[in-house]
């Protein structure tokens, strides 16, 4: 009862009646409501001392219970979790904790647990109502030093060491919190946004929108509950389809970052530009359209084996990015033609058409280009989120 009282205040909205009504129509299921794919730290990324990370998380699905996954899948050392808590934020932005009590999370009955290198732990359910678009603060304390990968993404987070008198200061690193799931009687679909830095939200400045998947979640939130999909962002900056770039390749991490998401019904795959850009222009180190198409088909085969539909995203313009060239642009165009052919995926999201310049199709629209000619700015990411045909996400 104490949990219900606390988290009813945390949610800011009593959903008991809504949940009860929905329960009459469908049995509750666990569904992904937020995600952040694990990625390795670089050799130059700094080590953090024992301390606490605070993550501000926006849910994309409502439910009557929550479960957290804390991951060290790409870590370089074993970690010791000293404790995990959930609380309400003090305001519309930032990581300050509000006046409501802090709720302690347990893992198989324990507050403190070991998190070995390469492992993930899942919390016990928190039984209480949560609503769509609700922000919560998840605090993860480590008794050991940690080394998270750095990032330029706008996700709001802060860190404080365990030393006496230490205060929380903003930090830009990849979170150890990898998945938030909710139990819902109305979770008709769950979408995993899968890709590289463009999906990850690199250079995006809107902390809680976090790239085009956040804009997609906003659009879905406006639909009736019976049509509202949760959105889980599993983009990783630098990721590739065929080979390990940053973190495990798309084909290998499918099982970790897609299959493990509860209730996943759809994947929107936007990946391949790093394969093309990092490859050579010719010879054995060049990436050909046929190689990427093969990779896409392998990804789709994995998804279809689990009953998951895959929408293919066309690769966005990048001719003037540092690692591209006219030869590689021809490869991008050939890959996009194959994606648009409707012969690979269950549907297509034409991200390229959403952001390309009408006069120079190999470039982004100037108003969407922050200057690196590769990663769309917030306006461009919003246009990409608007490009998804919501009818393709019907269960």
Regions flagged by a language model, labelled:
Residues 1-9:
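Bacterial N-terminal signal peptides that target proteins for export
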Residues 208-238, 251-252, 257:
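Phosphate-binding active sites in nucleotide-utilizing proteins
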Residues 277, 316-395:
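Catalytic His-Asp segment of secreted/periplasmic serine-dependent ester chemistry enzymes
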Residues 22-194, 203-207, 225:
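N-terminal secretory targeting modules
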Residues 190-195, 199, 230-235, 265-271, ...:
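Structural recognition of the beta-strand scaffold that forms the well-ordered cores
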Residues 296-304:
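Surface-exposed amphipathic alpha-helices with a cationic face
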Residues 204, 236-291:
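Oxyanion-hole/transition-state-stabilizing segment in secreted/luminal serine hydrolases
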Residues 8-18:
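Bacterial N-terminal signal peptides
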């Amino acid at each position: 009862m104490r949990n219900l009282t606390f988290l009813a205040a945390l949610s800011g909205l009593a959903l008991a009646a809504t949940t009860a009504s929905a329960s009459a129509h469908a049995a509750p299921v666990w569904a992904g409501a937020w995600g952040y794919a694990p990625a390795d730290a670089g050799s130059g990324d700094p080590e953090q001392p024992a301390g606490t990370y605070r993550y501000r998380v926006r849910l994309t699905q409502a439910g009557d219970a929550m479960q957290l996954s804390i991951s060290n899948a790409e870590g370089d050392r074993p970690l010791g979790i000293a404790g995990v808590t959930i609380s309400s934020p003090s305001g519309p932005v930032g990581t300050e904790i509000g006046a409501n009590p802090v709720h302690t999370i347990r893992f198989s009955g324990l507050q403190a647990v070991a998190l070995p290198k390469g492992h993930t732990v899942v919390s016990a359910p928190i039984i209480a109502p949560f609503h769509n678009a609700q922000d919560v603060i998840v605090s993860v304390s480590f008794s050991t030093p940690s080394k998270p990968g750095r990032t330029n993404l706008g996700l709001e987070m802060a860190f404080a060491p365990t030393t006496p008198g230490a205060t929380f200061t903003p930090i830009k690193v990849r979170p150890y919190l990898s998945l938030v799931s909710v139990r819902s009687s109305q979770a008709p679909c769950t979408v995993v946004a899968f890709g590289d830095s463009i999906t990850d939200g690199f250079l995006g400045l809107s902390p809680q929108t976090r790239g085009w998947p956040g804009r997609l979640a906003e659009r879905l939130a406006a639909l009736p509950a019976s049509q509202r999909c949760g959105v889980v962002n599993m983009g990783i900056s630098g990721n590739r389809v065929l080979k390990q770039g940053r973190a495990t390749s798309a084909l290998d991490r499918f099982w970790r970052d897609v299959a493990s998401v509860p209730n996943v019904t759809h994947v929107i795959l936007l990946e391949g530009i790093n394969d093309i850009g990092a490859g050579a222009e010719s010879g054995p180190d060049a990436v050909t359209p046929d190689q990427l198409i093969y990779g896409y088909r392998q990804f789709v085969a994995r998804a279809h084996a689990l009953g998951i539909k895959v929408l293919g995203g066309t690769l966005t313009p990048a001719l003037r990015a540092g690692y591209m060239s006219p030869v590689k642009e021809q490869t991008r165009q050939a890959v996009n033609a194959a994606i648009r052919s409707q012969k690979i995926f269950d549907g297509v999201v034409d991200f390229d058409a959403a952001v390309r310049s009408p006069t120079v199709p190999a470039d982004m629209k100037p108003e969407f280009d922050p200057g690196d000619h590769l990663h769309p700015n917030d306006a461009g990411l919003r246009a990409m989120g608007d490009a998804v045909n919501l009818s393709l996400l019907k269960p």
